[in-house]
């Protein structure tokens, strides 16, 4: 186990910056997930930690030692890649133990440690097979075993589950979490998959455009997103976002005429401001269209998710998602009313996209169509 300090780390390719001054403190034994869309710099940051990319600026320290000038093999990290990176001509046992062989570890000790790793990853029946004879999940476990056997201070995972089908991804998420509990090593996992991020992380690091948008537990990031980007990126469905203006009466006005009344004490300081109102799908519920204060819309399509459903509504071209857990009869094309939980509203500055502090609403008024 080892703490990691990332201080004002930058990366540029020529004149093109791709990582802009990232600061992050990772505790010893912590499981960190870096989440973001393609091209946000998350894999580049991971590769700089591993030593596979040069650092343009800033400093990375692992276990108290600055590693900027260290070779990858000197950093105490083991990396698991998306494409497994197994040697096709070697057996599972040979793949797992290859790093020890190169390091000159005695054959008896190699065999003992290979057996331990194979048992931990349920690979014992496959030790004499070659990668071509394995399933995708088995190959990924071999890749993990090859990292485990080195007994590293830090595990680095670069989208390791992307090539697996949905069922295998679920199984491998559980496998990785069990592995982390067993070994206790500091782990950094890069993904664009929100489900992976939310289920694996002790803390999430959400990146966008080479910058860190938010760091926090999955619960903090989901329930208290600090920017419009995080609100719209984290969560399935994404947070409902409506852009409008706070008028002189302290009412949020969007789509020219639709209105949501806000608490006077919050709206008073925001009169005349362009803001983005955000609300999770589960903070809304369906009511009859003529219910007092209901937002009138049309059910566009319904996602059936087994234990729950999501109604994707359309009102004059604006999308709005409502999560249902109770049995409600609704089908595409039905007129619906939407009631919202004003305690769950967040406001973001339209120009910067940042959360307006203390913008979680309480005691707000009705919604008017």
Curated annotation (Swiss-Prot):
Role according to the record: Part of the ABC transporter complex UgpBAEC involved in sn-glycerol-3-phosphate (G3P) import. Responsible for energy coupling to the transport system.
Localization per record: Cell inner membrane
Organism: Rhizobium etli (strain ATCC 51251 / DSM 11541 / JCM 21823 / NBRC 15573 / CFN 42)
GO cellular component: ATP-binding cassette (ABC) transporter complex, substrate-binding subunit-containing
Enzyme Commission number: 7.6.2.10
Broad class of enzyme this protein falls into: translocase
GO MF entries: ABC-type glycerol-3-phosphate transporter activity; ATP binding; ATP hydrolysis activity
Oligomeric form and interacting partners: The complex is composed of two ATP-binding proteins (UgpC), two transmembrane proteins (UgpA and UgpE) and a solute-binding protein (UgpB).
Protein name stated in the entry: sn-glycerol-3-phosphate import ATP-binding protein UgpC 2
Gene symbol of the encoding locus: ugpC2
């Amino acid at each position: 186990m080892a703490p990691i300090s990332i201080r004002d780390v930058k990366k540029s390719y020529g004149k093109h910056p791709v990582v802009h001054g990232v600061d992050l403190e990772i505790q010893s034994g912590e499981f960190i997930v870096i989440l973001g869309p393609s091209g946000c710099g998350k894999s580049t940051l991971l590769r700089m930690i591993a030593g596979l990319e040069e650092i343009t600026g800033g400093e990375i320290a692992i276990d108290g030692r600055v590693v900027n000038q260290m070779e990858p093999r000197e950093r105490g990290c083991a990396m698991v890649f998306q494409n497994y990176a197994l040697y096709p001509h070697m057996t599972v046992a040979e793949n797992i133990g290859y790093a020890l062989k190169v390091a000159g570890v005695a054959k008896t000790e190699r065999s003992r440690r290979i057996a331990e790793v194979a048992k931990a990853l349920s690979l014992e029946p496959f030790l004499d097979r070659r990668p071509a004879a394995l399933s995708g999940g088995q190959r990924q476990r071999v890749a993990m075993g090859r990292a485990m056997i080195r007994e590293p201070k830090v595990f680095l995972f670069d989208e390791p589950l992307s090539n697996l089908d949905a069922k295998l991804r679920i199984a491998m998420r559980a496998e990785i979490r069990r592995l982390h509990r067993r070994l206790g090593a500091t782990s950094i996992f890069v993904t664009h998959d929100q489900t992976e991020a939310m289920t694996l992380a002790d803390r999430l690091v959400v990146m966008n455009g080479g910058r860190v948008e938010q760091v926090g537990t999955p619960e903090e990031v989901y329930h208290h997103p600090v920017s419009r980007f995080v609100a719209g990126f984290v969560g399935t469905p994404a947070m409902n976002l409506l852009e409008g203006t706070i008028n002189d009466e302290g009412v949020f006005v969007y789509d020219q005429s639709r209105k949501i009344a806000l608490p006077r004490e919050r709206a008073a300081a925001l009169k005349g401001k362009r803001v983005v109102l955000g609300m999770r799908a589960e903070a809304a519920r369906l009511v009859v269209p003529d219910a007092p204060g209901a937002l009138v819309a049309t059910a566009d399509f319904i996602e059936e998710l087994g234990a729950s459903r999501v109604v994707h509504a359309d009102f004059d071209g604006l999308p709005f998602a409502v999560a249902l857990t109770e049995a409600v009869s609704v089908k595409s094309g039905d007129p619906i009313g939407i009631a919202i939980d004003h305690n769950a509203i967040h406001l973001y500055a339209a120009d910067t996209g940042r959360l307006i502090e203390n913008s979680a609403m309480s005691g707000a008024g009705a919604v008017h169509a």
